[in-house]
Amino acid sequence: METTTKKARSLYIPYAGPVLLEFPLLNKGSAFSVEERRNFNLSGLLPEVVESIEEQAERAWLQYQGFKTEIDKHIYLRNIQDTNETLFYRLVQNHLEEMMPVIYTPTVGAACERFSEIYRRARGVFISYPNRHNMDDILQNVPNHNIKVIVVTDGERILGLGDQGIGGMGIPIGKLSLYTACGGISPAYTLPVVLDVGTNNQQLLNDPLYMGWRHPRITDDEYYAFVDEFIQAVKQRWPDILLQFEDFAQKNAMPLLTRYRDEICSFNDDIQGTAAVTVGTLIAASRAAGSQLSEQKIVFLGAGSAGCGIAEQIIAQTQREGLSEDAARQNVFMVDRFGLLTDRMPNLLPFQAKLVQKCDNLQHWDTENDVLSLLDVVRNVKPDILIGVSGQTGLFTEEIIREMHKHCPRPIVMPLSNPTSRVEATPQDIIAWTEGNALVATGSPFSPVIWKDKIYPIAQCNNAYIFPGIGLGVIASGASRITDEMLMSASETLAKHSPLVNNGEGLVLPALKDIQVVSRAIAFAVGKMAQQQGVAVKTSAEALQQAIDDNFWKPEYRDYRRTSI
């Protein structure tokens, strides 16, 4: 963790007594000094000893270790977050590799499923459809006036778990925790939001503890009008906001991104963030093998908005490497539950239509099947890269992986579905089926694989390598939009930090302990590209770096001075 080179300015605080202790952004707990306890009416409300934040963090770490299940650890950390945010982030940064899977995937999935059961205290904004006409008033109720990043979900497609209704709030909370822990964005600048448009999850509707609007999901024109009211209210309240769409259903994710990306500074992490980290990983893996991404044939299992978003960014990258658009598209094969996407397949979604293969080019394939399965595609394409974004467990079978390995000595296999229970194949199986020759990157965290007395580290293709840096870059540069080129610059920067590329060994992605360094580098690349593209005011490189440093928040207590409201 970086240390400050100069003492931070004092904060002037209008709150005192129990009110101050109940304010998570300002509460220091036992770390309030003797003078602060006297000035803020805290004398006698805290134990005698004045502790440092490291002493507090050590106690919290010991308490954390006493919990045996991941969900109990998650609940404990969320309680600290809702009590003392500075301590929460110091603790998480001290133990990032241990705690990141607890505050986010995979544990956050269980927290979303059990949201109403484990609910302790409100965090963020809940906007239900019955309150749609009070949108402006609701946002005015947010006490933080300087919000810079919103993560919003409607809870319909939470990870691979489907419709979790209001329980989806766990995702924006977790995501914004990583914006701060990994990207240094002050928690005072962040706001999680859930749009409660009902739920089609009958189990939730029947649950007496369910805290959301008990109604089937609104759809079509009503739904889009509601989202539009929200967007307009956000623009009115915080005109310079960065808005991240998160875990919207496939039918809504791409239309919302397309509709609003040129109206408000926004992006969809499931589509664009996943694509950026995947492309960064593939660039690094290709370079480590002495080749380029444009030389690879790539097969996808899963042709939803996330899979197609990754495919389009791969195509853009291979065009940058010199391929024509037609040649780039001929190297990418999309398979969904109906088989390979072809130009004769009916009822394709608009974002799928550009990713079809021409049936005329498949006449020579060795198959008698009308529907071209994943095995058919792997057998005939002989891919170098296999990517899973299906949300269905076990679909990368032994037969498929062994067939791929027949024709590719060092296959790259990326089962990216979340959470762990939905992964297309486990790293252990993939390593065994390829005789230890596969390079594996997963969406959820996995322990290193031991096979024939050799240890194989498993890279987690985690969006947290990308979105915190993008957020920091947008804030530091004042970018008004997030362009495709800004996302590509993030991918390229991530690839440049690959230990496998730089050292010839190790993981294809940086260690999590280095994620703040990576986020700062991505922030600079994104901010610079924003300036080049005219969506941010041009400054010198030194000024941009200074803006990044100035906006990089550290979990350290500041001295307080008393003032009136």
UniProtKB/Swiss-Prot annotation:
Listed EC numbers: 1.1.1.38
Key words of the record: Metal-binding, NAD, Oxidoreductase
Catalysed reaction, written as an equation: (S)-malate + NAD(+) = pyruvate + CO2 + NADH; oxaloacetate + H(+) = pyruvate + CO2
GO molecular function: malate dehydrogenase (decarboxylating) (NAD+) activity; metal ion binding; NAD binding; oxaloacetate decarboxylase activity
Active site: Y104 (proton donor), K175 (proton acceptor)
Keyword Iron set for record: no
Record-linked SMART domains: malic, Malic_M
Site (described: Important for activity): D270
One Pfam family recorded for the sequence: Malic_M
GO cellular component: cytosol
Co-factor: note: Divalent metal cations. Prefers magnesium or manganese.
Transmembrane segments: none
Coiled coil: none
InterPro entries: Aminoacid_DH-like_N_sf, Malic_enzyme_CS, Malic_N_dom, Malic_N_dom_sf, Malic_NAD-bd, Malic_OxRdtase, NAD(P)-bd_dom_sf, NAD_malic_enz_proteobac
Biological-process GO terms, alphabetical: malate metabolic process
Binding locations of a divalent metal cation: E246, D247, D270
Requisite cofactors: Mg(2+); Mn(2+)
Residues annotated as binding NAD(+): R157, D270, N418
Subunit structure: Homotetramer.
NCBIfam families: PRK13529.1
Family to which this protein belongs: Belongs to the malic enzymes family.
Name used for this protein in its record: NAD-dependent malic enzyme
Species this chain originates from: Salmonella newport (strain SL254)
Gene name in the database record: maeA
